[in-house]
Amino acid sequence: MTITQLKVFVKIAETGSFTKAGQALNMTQPAVSHAISAIEAELDVKLIIRDRRNGLMLTDTGKQILVHIREVLKGIEKVEQVAAAEKGLELGTIHIGTFSTASAYFMPKLISEFKQKYPKLELVLHEGTVNEVKEWLHTRMIDVGILLYPTEEMEYIHLKKDKMAVVLRDDHPLASHSAITLKDLDHEPMIVCDGGYESPFIDMFRQAGATLHPAFTVYNINTSISMIREGLGLAILSEMSMSGMPLPEHVVTRELDPQVYRDVQLAVPSLKEASLAAKLFIEMAKELFGAE
C-alpha cells in the first residue's frame, strides 16, 4: 500500500464519493478506483460497498481499518513535522472539531492568532454536535476537539467555566424571582438542546431531587429562544451560547441557585501522541483562554 492509496481511502470515507475524493486529491476517478482496488486486493477484504439507498458505505472491516489508516497517516505527518522543525519550519495540518457555540466563541480569535504566528500550518475546522465531535476524536478524524463533560477515553485541557442561566418569558411567574432553583423547574416544560447536552441535564436535575421534563428538543439556540418567546417552555442555556446575541422582547434570563457551570475543554486522544502542530495549537488555546 502506498501513502496515496491510504489518503484516497480516507477521503472516500469522508466524502462518501469517488468523484469528490478525486477532486479533493486532484486525481481522476479511474485513479481513485484503482487505488481502492489495490488496497482491497492486497488485504484480500472488501472495504467499500455500494448501497442503492445510501450510496457508498464502508464495510465493518473498512470502518475498523479506517481508524488505523488515519493513525498511520498522522504518524507520517509527525515524521514530516519533525523534519521540518529541524529546518526551522512549521508544517502540517490540524483538524479541529467543535460544536457551533464553541466555534463562534473560541475559533475566530484562536484561528486569527494562530495563523499570524504559524502561517504555514493549515487549520481545518469540522463543526458538528458534541456527540459528533466525540465520535470524530474516537475515529481519529480530528486531532483536537472542543467538548463538554469529559470522558475517560480522552485527555483534556480546561478552556472555560461557562455559567448557566434560566431563559424564560418576562410574564412567567418565575421571572419575578431573582434566582431560580432546579426544584422550581421540576414541573416546567423545558426546551432542551440535543447533540450531547441532554444526559448531563438529566443528571443535574436528578442530583437536585427534581425531574427534567423536556417539552421540545432542538438543535439550535436561536430556535430555543424563539420558542421561549412564544411561551412554549423554558430553557437552561449558557452565557457563552448567548454571548453577542440580543434577547428578543419579553425574553429574560435569571440566575440558577446554586450557580451551575459547565466546563468547556479541549480534548485529545493522547497529549503524548499528538503531532507537533496539534501541540502548538493546544498551547495557543491555553495562552488565549486557559485562564477563563
Curated annotation (Swiss-Prot):
It holds the Pfam family HTH_1. GO terms for molecular function: DNA-binding transcription factor activity; sequence-specific DNA binding. Residues 18-37 bind DNA. Residues 1-59 form the HTH lysR-type domain. The keyword Transport does not apply. GO terms for biological process: regulation of DNA-templated transcription. The gene is yvbU. This is Uncharacterized HTH-type transcriptional regulator YvbU. Belongs to the LysR transcriptional regulatory family. Gene3D superfamilies: Periplasmic binding protein-like II, Winged helix-like DNA-binding domain superfamily/Winged helix DNA-binding domain.
